[in-house]
């Protein structure tokens, strides 16, 4: 018996040594690739700088001062050429990149596309598309022919896409010119923005704090003035959290309002909770103009992806003068947000009431159960798909907690969850989230379907059009905090689980009064609350947004509500 135990121990040691040696060699090879990619980015930035410098400084600064509508109109009139617009935004994006490390690649082909559009515009029969020549930034995971989509994995560098995604193809048809790609967290399953290939992207308001994720590069670039309109993706808040952290506006549509054929996913094969593209901009009205044109021409996507229904832009909903019924909440029952986020919702409530809308309390049911269902449906294989990919790569330090959790067998997590629950109930609950077998997975899917019915039933009972709520649990925290507070996505992931359209609009900033309330009133009942409280200290001046959500195919009602809040806050 002892002999077999010794053999078992020796075998385990031998396996560990073999695994460690192989991984060390792998990391050494990947470090060379990562350094090469970073060197290539430096050269790429300099090429973009040379292109930008071809434009007269005064002209460049004037073009850069135009807002989205002004630039679009100047391009339509021919007062600004497409090449001038691209060179101006190469310059602006370089400045933003130097401040935040937001860009992973400048799409140098943008100049060629701009030249072609300018040549076509000279033809007497040519009709300019509605977004002719407007520069467009793209999250790095979106497929652009000839460019990488690594999702922060070193192993995927130098594997460029062979064709544009349907959406990118559509954006080009509308006249938009993709001019750069922006940074993401490794695997996309985090609300920070760091990876071993391109490093950490910082918040334009405070470099010690994160810009959010996973569309963090977009949030940082737009927040720093480097782009007028960009495209992110969102599977748990990846558009909305960066918008909230960086003082920008964006929306995650319901799943089928954009085509998915030929796209990619952070975790393929999760049918009930899937990512969708979503626009991000400095303000809501830019998002509206973008979607009005994209959804006005949605047949382009539907013809190429039969699973994308031809649901056109509904101007009657967006422009309706009928007063809305709005349900609101400032605490979801799972994670109490810090004072500034609650204040932002209450101020938005007053703005909507002043506009004549009815705003009543709404209580989302059973959020603790929802958090379990969300993580179970996203990590439907217990995290093994992402874990297997990470074990073949350099692992980003800010996601090591998730990696450690995925490496622990589910049955061990279940056993450990009971003693953990005695001192840290919420962590104990999340440790029971991952599925053990297909029976539990089927149960989870059934529970999600039942929850959707329950939620919309409550909305219909009160005849609600939209929901108003916090965008997150806190303002932008330091870069290491998202990995320590993985459950901080409850306010956004709920609407991925429901497949609602949901957007974020900036409303206010953290005040000294908010910080005093944080110190004196914010709970410290468990480790997550303690971390959140500490991370929020010193955040005075950081932007705060609110979230608006509505059932599928009612994104125009979401945008209308967001726009009314924006007008009340900014006066324009």
UniProtKB/Swiss-Prot annotation:
Its EC number is 3.5.1.99. Substrate binds at residues 214, 235-238. Keywords: Coiled coil, Hydrolase, Lipid degradation, Lipid metabolism, Phosphoprotein, Signal. It catalyses: N-(5Z,8Z,11Z,14Z-eicosatetraenoyl)-ethanolamine + H2O = ethanolamine + (5Z,8Z,11Z,14Z)-eicosatetraenoate; (9Z)-octadecenamide + H2O = (9Z)-octadecenoate + NH4(+); (5Z,8Z,11Z,14Z,17Z-eicosapentaenoyl) ethanolamine + H2O = (5Z,8Z,11Z,14Z,17Z)-eicosapentaenoate + ethanolamine; N-(9Z-hexadecenoyl) ethanolamine + H2O = (9Z)-hexadecenoate + ethanolamine. GO terms for molecular function: amidase activity; fatty acid amide hydrolase activity. Expressed in the pharynx, some pharyngeal neurons, the posterior intestine and anal depressor muscles. The active site is at 139 (charge relay system), 214 (charge relay system), 238 (acyl-ester intermediate). Residues 32-63 form a coiled coil. Catalyzes the hydrolysis of endogenous amidated lipids like anandamide (AEA or N-(5Z,8Z,11Z,14Z-eicosatetraenoyl)-ethanolamine) and eicosapentaneoyl ethanolamide (EPEA or (5Z,8Z,11Z,14Z,17Z-eicosapentaenoyl) ethanolamine), as well as other fatty amides, to their corresponding fatty acids, thereby regulating the signaling functions of these molecules. EPEA promotes dauer formation and may constitute a signal of high nutrient availability. Breakdown of EPEA may promote lifespan extension when nutrient availability is high. Belongs to the amidase family. This is Fatty acid amide hydrolase 1. It comes from Caenorhabditis elegans.
């Amino acid at each position: 018996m002892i002999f077999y135990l010794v053999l078992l121990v020796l075998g385990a040691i031998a396996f560990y040594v073999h695994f460690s040696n192989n991984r060390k060699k792998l990391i050494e090879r990947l470090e060379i690739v990562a350094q090469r990619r970073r060197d290539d980015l430096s050269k790429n930035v300099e090429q973009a700088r040379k292109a930008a410098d071809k434009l007269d400084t005064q002209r460049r600064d004037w073009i850069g001062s135009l807002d989205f509508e002004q630039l679009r109109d100047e391009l339509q009139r021919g007062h600004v050429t497409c090449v001038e617009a691209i060179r101006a935004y190469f310059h602006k994006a370089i400045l933003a990149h130097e401040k935040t490390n937001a860009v992973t690649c400048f799409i140098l082909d943008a100049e060629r596309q701009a030249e072609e559009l300018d040549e076509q515009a000279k033809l007497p029969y040519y009709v300019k598309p509605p977004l002719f020549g407007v520069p467009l930034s793209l999250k790095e995971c979106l497929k652009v022919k000839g460019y990488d989509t690594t999702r922060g994995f070193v192993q995927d560098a130098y594997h460029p896409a062979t064709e544009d995604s349907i959406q990118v193809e559509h954006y080009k048809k509308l006249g938009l010119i993709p001019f750069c790609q922006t940074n993401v967290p490794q695997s996309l399953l985090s609300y920070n923005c760091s990876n071993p290939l391109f490093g950490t992207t910082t918040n334009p308001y405070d470099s010690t704090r994160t810009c959010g994720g996973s569309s963090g590069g977009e949030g940082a670039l737009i927040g720093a003035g480097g782009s007028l309109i960009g495209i992110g993706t969102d599977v748990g808040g990846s558009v909305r959290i960066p918008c909230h952290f960086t003082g920008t506006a964006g929306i995650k549509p319901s799943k089928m309002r954009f085509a998915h054929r030929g796209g990619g996913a952070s975790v393929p094969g999760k049918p009930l909770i899937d990512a969708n593209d979503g626009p991000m901009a400095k303000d809501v009205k830019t998002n509206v103009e973008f979607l009005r044109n994209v959804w006005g021409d949605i047949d382009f996507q539907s013809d190429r992806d039969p699973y994308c229904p031809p649901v056109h832009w509904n101007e009657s909903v967006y422009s309706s003068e009928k007063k809305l019924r709005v349900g609101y909440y400032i605490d979801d029952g799972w994670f109490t947000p810090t004072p500034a986020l609650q204040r932002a919702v209450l101020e938005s409530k007053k703005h909507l009431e002043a506009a004549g809308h009815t705003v009543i309390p709404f209580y989302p049911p059973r959020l603790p159960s929802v958090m379990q269902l969300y993580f179970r449906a996203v990590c439907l294989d217990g995290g093994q798909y992402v874990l297997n990919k990470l074990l073949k790569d350099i692992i980003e330090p800010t996601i090591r907690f998730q990696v450690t959790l995925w490496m622990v067998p589910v049955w061990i997590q279940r056993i450990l969850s009971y003693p953990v629950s005695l001192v840290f109930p919420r962590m104990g609950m999340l440790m029971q989230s991952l599925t053990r077998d297909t029976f539990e997975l089927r149960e989870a899917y059934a529970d999600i379907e039942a929850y959707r019915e329950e939620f919309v039933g409550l909305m219909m009972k009160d005849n609600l059009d939209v929901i108003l709520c916090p965008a997150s649990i806190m303002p932008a925290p330091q870069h290491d905090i998202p990995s320590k507070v993985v459950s901080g996505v409850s306010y956004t992931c709920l609407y991925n689980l429901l497949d609602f359209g949901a957007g974020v609009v900036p409303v206010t900033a953290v005040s000294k009064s908010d910080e005093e309330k944080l110190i004196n009133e914010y709970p410290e009942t468990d480790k997550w609350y303690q971390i959140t409280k500490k991370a929020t200290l010193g955040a005075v001046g950081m932007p705060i947004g609110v979230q608006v959500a509505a059932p599928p195919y009612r994104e125009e009602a979401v945008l209308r509500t967001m726009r009314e809040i924006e007008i009340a806050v900014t006066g324009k």
